[in-house]
Amino acid sequence: MNWHTQLRTHGYAHFPGLTPASLALAAREAIDRDLRDNYDSERQLEYDNQSYCPGLRGSPPIMDLLLRAPIMKIVDEALGIGSVGWDKGQIAIRRSRNFPREIPPEPHIDGFASGLNGLEEGKIYSHTALVGVFLTPVLRPFAGNFTVWPGSHYVYESYFRARGARAMREPMPAPEIGQAVQLTCGVGDVVFCHYLLGHTAAVNTAEIDRVAVYFRIWLRDLEERRWECLTNIWEGWKI
């Protein structure tokens, strides 16, 4: 199955070792330095719900994971570089042993206010695609794994079509979306997802932190056709 088919069918495509080792190492070293120099325990809720190392977001070591890496060619093939924008990257860390036992992961889609993520209620802050770049190995379940619900992008599409535009002002939907898959990843692996794919991070019962950087990508005219893209999920895509 090629990545086009995997993305359309399952809602995500996994590219093992796609990121050059030099870029992954530079990003990891920058994150480690920032944690050592700037970590503030009083900001832990912000780190967990928005981003670790906020001062590092948008910096060359982080942005190079997207802009100087092969994933950018895939984004271009899928959406067209001239048609999209992107954010400064979210530095996401699941600390080792952050939970005492394995618990089933709970899905979400981005862009809904949680009271902790800095978003205002009454609107969906959707985007178009998500790129995850993994900087530490994730070799078994419940190790902070990026977790997906394959095919759930179509379930959410059907939900929005049935619910109608009032869903734009409502809390995050929670339809039945099937079984979760916890992805195992090596350093430099990349996962490219449709925005509407249900996903989360599993708890980390492993001995090492899980470090990843996520980039949100959006069609430049998304604000004008946000509802259209929620109910016709391949609108604007080239694949």
Residue ranges: model-predicted function:
Residues 58-64, 119, 175-181, 200-202:
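Active-site rim elements
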Residues 1-9, 15-119, 236:
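Non-heme Fe(II)-dependent double-stranded beta-helix
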Residues 24-25, 94-95, 100, 140-142, ...:
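Short catalytic/ligand-binding loop motif for oxyanion handling, primarily in non-cytosolic enzymes
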Residues 104-112, 148, 198-202:
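Histidine-centered catalytic micro-motifs
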Residues 125, 138-200, 222:
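Double-stranded beta-helix
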